[in-house]
From Swiss-Prot:
Start and end residues of each stretch annotated as Disordered: 1-35, 159-233, 478-498, 1084-1113
CSD2 domain residues: 501-574
Similarity section: Belongs to the RNR ribonuclease family.
Domain DIS3L2 C-terminal: start-end pairs: 973-1030
SUPFAM superfamilies: Nucleic acid-binding proteins
EC number of the protein: 3.1.-.-
Listed GO biological process terms: mRNA catabolic process; nuclear-transcribed mRNA catabolic process
Keyword tags: Cytoplasm, Hydrolase, Nuclease
Protein name as annotated: Uncharacterized ribonuclease C609.01
Positions with biased composition (Polar residues): 208-228, 1090-1106
């Protein structure tokens, strides 16, 4: 055998460390640990420091580059005029730069370039050339030099600024914000005597303008380079906290910060002249109050992270409650709760941030007070008495479980109309469940904190949305005339609009963006109504600490709401998909090896060209099957294209692939990962010699054992390509395909450690938890199902990925790229389903036991209930580097101790990186050449963008379904379908339309009920129905008033709110839905009248108002009550309506009343 081939030996694979095992480092004993806080491994904190330094190094290198963005033309004074300037290309925004950072102009020498202020005239800082002045160098050394004074010495006798700008008398406040768990316990995580964990953050001296935007500061380049070359972080075990000089302004800013921003100090707004001295700007600018904390200087972050004062993690915003966010880190066992926009500090979804921990009890108390204040204000506007307002506000706060509106069968408190509409707009745009993380004293977060710096922003430069002349709130809409008069008076010109307009992003997690009025089309102010259905692209330009909203730039209009192509473009931009074309030079940088392959390359590889290899559904890898002389013993070969041989590290094509991360597969189209010509050259092609990395396994199909397994580089000669449809059609007649299917069953049994007969199709739905759905364009059945041959190939891929990861772990365990999926923290729902169905599962069940139980269950409803419940519980997978004694890197969903991505190198960048690691292992170089910091940067970028791409694919699926449903709604009325009940509660019903993949939580306050009762022991919900007009009740409760709904209401709803036509598609799948949408006649219409009847109905419905509260009240006693029992695992009838009157299509799903059945 070729010496480059490696025989797989399980004895060389390191075992997964036990959480209870004692590490060899200076880990404190269990008696010395504080509470249940986890011990922080030194390599985990060290990895954060190294990653930060890698970002700073990339920052300093990228500032000398200028990427052009040819697809976007910012609107100028006349954006739609014929004399459009061709040289208005904007430089591509630097993803590493915090908000407000500007990039140098390559046409201007750096020593003469100066930052430009908002008006475009004047400067806001010194020239870049002044950074080398002796004055600035001396000042930098004084700022970052340590001192011996204690932190408490600076905090005594401090006073905060007035709460309101311009207050007559400055009143001192003593309110200080506590850090997390500060106490006298020497082993407290924030105790100075405990060097093993977090210590309280000390304020930083420096100009407010520098901290607001580090890259605009005069010391930014000097500080970044100094931190990279002179600051070496020490071990967090023994290093003491550095003492840093403080100024009164920065002390007040960090110590007296409150969540509502009331006690934040005024900004100093200091600047520097050419000699380095401080100068003040106008007094008017000093009147602006800081609403957010300035960011910490980038140069100070490595020290703070190394001493445990700050944690680094990725920020995720709650989609339903956008004031709350969470930061996920590798250090803590649970996410860090971020309360409110002030603590989130101008960050966006997916940002890599630095967080300081705060006291959880104080954060929760502040949140409770804010919610009670909001509820009290809303109740006061409704005319309630003062006593009633106070009592109801306390009752409806987060301290009680009645916040969602139900209390043991009585509709005591319904959600506010704002809450109902917000939930509908968020969940209606989604394919899967959108859980609202409700906080109560019983379910308070374990950690809380606030953001003090943004390290990396991987999100795209643009987002989609609509324009509004005034800020979208009730007060502005009621006073449009006064706003118009005031703006005209202040400008001195009659009819001139305001100075700014508002951009409302389609993604509600992005705040409103202020756009300068000179960037909008000239006719926007005169014909504002013409732009209500226009979708634009805009980007955030800067976000100062004194502004509640960011300032942005308007780029272009992409079309009209309701157009499927416009929605597709919006998805691409909102989820950071790279829409620009590849440079032509990248298409010619890779050439296929000549045939025959040179002899020197053949000597390095195992020659498998004589094997009959074939491809099924993909050109990333090929298979071969050999039947030996022994009955039941076969040889299965999996040969993956060696893309890493062609795409060399650090070449331009490699850089572009690293930026794109992976291919984006959407139903409306795909965003390629590599140029088309390059992909064709490096993919496997039948009839050509191809370079591959092969894993060959010898299986005994009778005993289900692996006799031999080998891994190494090879050369193959593929003979044929078979589509998935053809493979499935010939599965019963083709011997090779049957052996592939049998091999998949054997390998899956080995992975799950069982000898039971498995249903591989039942495991397919968990592919959602590991990334994008493969072959999404070929979906024609259920979203959760695929061809049996496709399921078999998926299981073979999982086995191969596990073996590759295990082999790399045996070579260099500290640098191997792994794919981990953490075990769910809460198994309550799965245990409840197990008790309900009689399945033997518990919270201590292993992943193999859970998956085996699902794959062997015979009852279809029980299997679906277990599938969907577990899928909803599972965490998202992510990439990580190596292992440590405090980190779990196992893959829960696939039941693998080690897992990676290897089989699709033409679609994912991580697969190419894994191939490079394999090359190092084959060549006998255990010390992987790529440094640790670069690997961390790669995995962080891949994690964030992979999450964006998966959400984009889900949004694409939902948009496609809504277009089909909307087409049927227009012709045949509401779509009736069966739904599977997943869970019930006293406040909601969770249902899944299995064939479409639609998941919804139906709140009971949107159903026309007279009463309801929930039996917690039996998990049953009893609904007493008032009327059969359930769809009309739901739409009226949500106050839906869109053009799409109004057209539907006039055509199909009668005077009593009943739908005159219902399209019955109870057992339809996706392909049936597509056929029905394409047909010219109504499909499965329940009722169809003649032309005269339709005209009469349309006329009568158009003359009656059926949307008022009086009509809802009249419906309550119109029908006799009918009691319906709902339980998990039951099938119910639902009505579906799709609304395409927004940038992203909405779907409304409600239960069909049994009165109309």
């Amino acid at each position: 055998m070729d010496p480059h081939w490696k025989r797989h030996d399980s004895s060389n694979i390191p075992t997964q460390p036990s959480p209870s095992a004692s590490p060899k480092s200076n880990k404190p004993s269990s008696a010395q640990r504080f509470g249940n806080l986890p011990w922080v491994a030194p390599d985990v904190i060290q990895s954060q420091i190294e990653y930060l330094q890698a970002l700073q190094m990339q920052q300093s290198l990228s500032e000398s580059e200028n990427y052009l963005q040819p697809n976007f033309f910012p609107f100028q004074s006349g954006p739609f005029s014929k004399s459009r300037r061709e040289n208005t290309l904007l430089p591509r925004l630097n993803p590493l730069a915090p908000i407000g950072a500007r990039q140098p102009n390559p046409s201007i020498p750096q020593q003469f370039s100066k930052p430009i202020n908002e008006s475009g005239t004047g400067t806001m800082g010194p020239a870049v050339g002044e950074l080398t002045s002796p004055v600035m160098k001396n000042r930098a050394e004084s700022i970052f030099s340590p001192v011996t004074e204690s932190f408490e010495a600076f905090t005594q006798g401090m006073q905060t600024t007035p709460q309101r700008a311009g207050a007559g008398v400055s009143t001192a406040t003593s309110h200080t914000r506590r850090r997390s768990s500060a106490g006298t316990d020497p082993f407290s995580p924030v105790s100075p005597s405990n060097p093993n964990f977090l210590t309280p953050l000390k304020p930083i001296d420096g100009n407010q303008e520098w901290q607001q935007s580090p890259l605009e500061s005069p010391l930014s380049m000097h500080s970044l380079q100094e931190s990279l070359h002179s600051v070496e972080p020490e071990s967090p075990i023994f290093q003491q906290a550095p003492q840093i000089p403080l100024s009164n302004a920065s002390q007040q800013s960090y110590i007296n910060h409150s969540s509502d921003g009331a006690s934040l100090p005024q900004s100093s707004f200091l600047n520097f002249n050419s000699s380095g001295k401080r100068v003040s700007v106008s007094a008017a600018a000093q009147q602006h109050k800081n609403l957010f904390l300035p960011y910490l200087p980038q140069a100070s972050l490595p020290k703070f992270i190394g001493t445990g004062k700050l944690l680094v993690g990725t920020l995720h915003i709650n989609r339903k409650n956008r004031s709350d966010a969470y930061v996920i880190t590798d250090v803590l066992d649970e996410p860090i709760f971020i309360c409110g926009s002030k603590d989130r500090n101008r960050t966006l979804e997916g940002d890599l941030v630095a967080v300081e921990l705060l006291d959880v009890n104080e954060i929760m108390q502040t949140k409770r007070e804010k919610e009670e204040k909001k509820i009290r204000r809303n109740l006061s506007l409704s005319g309630s008495s003062k006593y009633s307002v106070n009592s109801k506000a306390k009752m409806m706060s987060i301290s009680t479980p009645m916040a969602l509106g139900m209390n043991r069968g009585v509709l005591s408190f319904e959600r506010s109309i704002e809450k109902r509409k917000n939930d509908y707009e968020v969940t209606g745009q989604s394919l899967s469940f959108v859980d609202d993380v409700s906080l109560t004293p019983d379910s308070a977060p374990k950690y809380a904190g606030h953001v003090v710096a943004v390290l990396n922003r991987p999100s795209g430069e643009t987002c989609s949305g609509t324009l509004a002349l005034y800020r979208p709130n009730s007060l502005a809409l009621k006073n449009q005339s006064s706003h118009r008069r005031n703006s005209s008076t202040s400008s001195g010109e009659t009819g001139k609009g305001p100075k700014i307009v508002w951009f409302k992003p389609s993604d509600k997690r992005i705040p409103l963006i202020a756009i300068s009025s000179d960037q909008v089309p000239p006719t926007f102010f005169t014909n504002n109504d013409d732009f209500k259905d226009k979708v634009f692209l805009a980007g955030i330009k800067r976000w100062p600490t004194t502004s509640l909203h960011p300032f942005g730039t308007l780029y272009e209009s992409i079309g009209t709401i309701g157009d499927p192509k416009v929605e597709y473009k919006a998805i691409l931009h909102d989820f950071s998909c790279h829409t620009y074309d590849f440079p032509e030079s990248l298409s010619h940088c890779v050439k296929r090896l000549p045939t025959p392959i040179p002899a020197e390359e053949l000597q390095k590889r195992y020659n498998l060209r004589d094997k009959l290899t074939f491809m099924i559904g993909t050109r990333d890898y090929a298979l071969h099957i050999d039947t030996g002389s022994i009955d039941g013993v076969i040889t299965l070969g999996i040969h993956v294209a060696d893309v890493a041989y062609y795409v060399k590290q650090d070449m331009p094509l490699d850089d572009e692939a690293a930026n794109r991360v992976s291919e984006v597969q959407l139903l409306q189209g795909s965003v390629p990962f590599l140029p088309k010509k390059v992909s064709e050259e490096i993919s496997l092609i039948e009839g050509h010699d191809c370079l591959t990395i092969s894993i060959v396994v010898q299986l005994d199909l009778k005993s289900g054992a692996v006799l031999q397994c080998s891994l190494g580089p090879s050369v193959i000669h593929p003979s044929s390509f078979i589509s998935l449809e053809s493979a499935q059609a010939n599965l019963q007649t083709n011997e090779a395909l049957q052996l592939v299917d049998a091999s998949a069953h054997v390998l899956t049994k080995l992975r799950l450690k069982t000898d039971k007969k498995l249903d591989l199709q039942s495991l397919y739905c968990f592919e959602f938890c590991d990334g994008q759905i493969p072959n999404i364009q070929n979906i024609n059945m259920s979203i959760f199902e695929a061809f049996p041959i496709a399921c078999s190939l998926q299981q073979i891929e999982h086995w191969v990925n596990e073996k590759v990861a295990s082999h790399l772990m045996s070579v260099f365990p500290s640098k191997v790229i792994l794919r981990k999926n953490q075990r769910p923290s809460d198994f309550a729902s799965l245990v409840a389903v197990s008790e309900l169905t009689g399945v033997n599962l518990s919270a201590s069940s292993t992943p193999s036991e859970i998956m085996t139980e699902i794959a062997t269950t015979k009852d279809k409803r029980t299997k679906m209930l277990l599938q969907l419940t577990l899928r909803r519980m599972c965490n998202e997978s992510e990439y990580t580097i190596g292992t440590s004694n405090a980190k779990d890197v196992s893959h829960f969903v696939f039941s693998c101790p080690y897992y990676t991505h290897f089989c699709h190198p033409t679609r994912r960048y991580i697969d190419i990186c894994v191939q490079r690691q394999l090359r190092e292992a084959f060549d006998g170089r255990p010390d992987f050449s790529k440094d640790y910091r670069s690997l961390l940067s790669i995995t962080q970028s891949c994690n964030t963008l992979s999450n964006f791409y998966r959400n984009a694919q889900e949004k694409s699926l939902h948009a496609y379904l809504c277009q089909l449903l909307h087409s049927i709604n227009l012709r045949s009325g509401l779509v009736k379908h069966k739904a599977f009940v997943l869970a019930v509660d006293q406040e909601y019903i969770d249902i899944v339309i299995y064939e479409f993949g639609l998941e919804r939580r139906i709140s009971l306050d949107l159903l026309p009920l007279s009463n309801c009762d929930f039996n917690e022991q039996k998990h049953e919900l009893y609904l007493s129905w008032r009327t059969n007009a359930s769809f009309f009740y739901a739409s009226s409760s949500l106050e839906i008033d869109t053009p799409c709904f109004n057209d539907f209401k006039k055509k199909f709803l009668d005077s009593n709110g009943m739908c005159k036509q219902i399209c019955d598609m109870m057992d339809a799948q996706v392909r049936d839905l597509a056929n029905a949408a394409e047909s010219q006649e109504s499909f499965y219409s329940k009722a169809r009248g003649n032309d005269s009847t339709s005209k009469t109905a349309k006329s009568s419905s158009g003359n009656q108002d059926i949307s008022g509260d009086g009509k809802l009240h009249s419906l309550r006693m119109k029908e006799p009550e009918v009691v319906q029992t709902i339980r998990p695992g039951q099938e119910v009838s639902v009505l579906i309506f799709a609304d395409t009157s927004a940038t992203y299509s909405l779907s409304l799903i409600t239960l069909q009343s049994p009165l109309s059945s």
